[in-house]
Amino acid sequence: MKRVKHQDVSAGELPGKIVAEPRQLRKQAGDWLKLRRADAGLSQADLAVRLGLKYYTFISQVENGFSRVPTELMGAWASELGLEPAAFARHLIMYYEPELHRLLFGAEKK
């Protein structure tokens, strides 16, 4: 399967093929999460405490694309950001598992 760089497709497209490396997609998800956290008025340390995490640096790892929001934390993470958990999970799946997202929901804009 040919991989193309993310810059080669329009920003809102999720075609049927892999369009970006997983690290690039995780970074895009992290950027979105960082904006949502800022909108909620939370620091990384605040969010980590609310989620029961031992280290706030995990939030940084997720926001910088080095890790993902664990499935078991998606509901709590969404709630702490004031977002509806199912919509939050659906949005993250678009970045973390783009092919699964396309199969389940079809292509949609980010």
Regions found by a protein language model. Give the residues of each.
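Core residues of bacterial helix-turn-helix
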Residues: A40, L51-G52, V62, L81
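DNA major-groove recognition helix of helix-turn-helix
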Residues: V62-E63, L73, L92
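A short, Lys/Arg-rich alpha-helix, primarily the initiator
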Residues: K2-D39
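Recognition helix of helix-turn-helix/homeodomain-like DNA-binding domains
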Residues: G52-R68
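Key DNA-contact positions within bacterial/archaeal DNA-binding proteins
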Residues: A45, Y56-T57, A86
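DNA major-groove recognition helix of helix-turn-helix/homeodomain DNA-binding modules
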Residues: Q7-D8, P70-F88
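Short basic helix-loop element that most often maps to the first helix and adjoining turn
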Residues: G30-R50, A76, E108
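Short, charged recognition helix plus adjacent turn
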Residues: S79, A87-K110
